[in-house]
């Protein structure tokens, strides 16, 4: 795309957003050009809170499908647009509603805590939703005598088991990017940059987390890199967050770890689903008023209860 085309697109996007009283929300894993034009950038919890309080008539969600669903569940009367409806999530896809219902029926006396990376139907059959930044706080509020079902991320679940000293029943889902980081590449990078701190998202498997100096959600990783006096960081999460890290820590250097050849994002750390959203698609969805998120009212109402529980307990 030519520079002039980008400038024109940005101007048109701003004009259309203002004309339709739309707010543009973007996740940290979006391309930098989308992050820069968004009205608000954040992690899943921050974006959920922003969606719950916005006065805009239209919410344009630059993220993946389940995130746009959350915005619609919280604001059923508002129009919620997603630039590309094919922007899915490997974690959400790993946990279909029918299988999850059967899973719950096998453990009727358990409290179901479900990661926000899940579809609306799964949220509807859950007790509480959590994000990576709120999960530990929520789990610690569950009585010790209650068994917890945690879905769908088994690596986040295993990390939380250690943090809270609570044994949970885990659904076997994973993120195709976080599970694919190469341990060999990480070790090589740590040798080459021996003063660098390793920052990791808890969706990474345990054999990678053991090397981390700090583990946290995208917002927590961003804050740590900003507050810490160290100037070199090796980052184990989707590389979109680096754009914001460089903004808040302009004097620091950030290194991206390659992924192995067995994952869904070969030799990179970009989520292929997140990157389906583009400036052109953002422009078109504002211009045309679609693709729009629509949900079954009953499912939406059921899912809202578990999301409200998250917002209250967070």
UniProtKB/Swiss-Prot annotation:
Pfam families for the chain: NadA
An individual GO BP term: 'de novo' NAD biosynthetic process from L-aspartate
Cofactor(s) for this UniProt protein: [4Fe-4S] cluster
Main location class: cytoplasm
GO cellular component, one term: cytosol
Pathway: Cofactor biosynthesis; NAD(+) biosynthesis; quinolinate from iminoaspartate: step 1/1
Sorted UniProt keywords: 4Fe-4S, Cytoplasm, Iron, Iron-sulfur, Metal-binding, Pyridine nucleotide biosynthesis, Transferase
Keyword Iron-sulfur (UniProt): yes
Keyword NAD belongs to the record: no
Gene3D superfamilies given in the database record: NadA-like
Cofactor annotation remark: Binds 1 [4Fe-4S] cluster per subunit.
EC number(s) recorded for this UniProt protein: 2.5.1.72
Catalysed reaction, written as an equation: iminosuccinate + dihydroxyacetone phosphate = quinolinate + phosphate + 2 H2O + H(+)
Positions with a binding annotation for [4Fe-4S] cluster: 89, 175, 271
Function (record text): Catalyzes the condensation of iminoaspartate with dihydroxyacetone phosphate to form quinolinate.
Family: Belongs to the quinolinate synthase family. Type 2 subfamily.
Matching PANTHER family: QUINOLINATE SYNTHASE, CHLOROPLASTIC (PTHR30573:SF0), QUINOLINATE SYNTHETASE A (PTHR30573)
Name of this chain's protein: Quinolinate synthase
Taxon lineage: Bacteria, Pseudomonadati, Pseudomonadota, Alphaproteobacteria, Rickettsiales
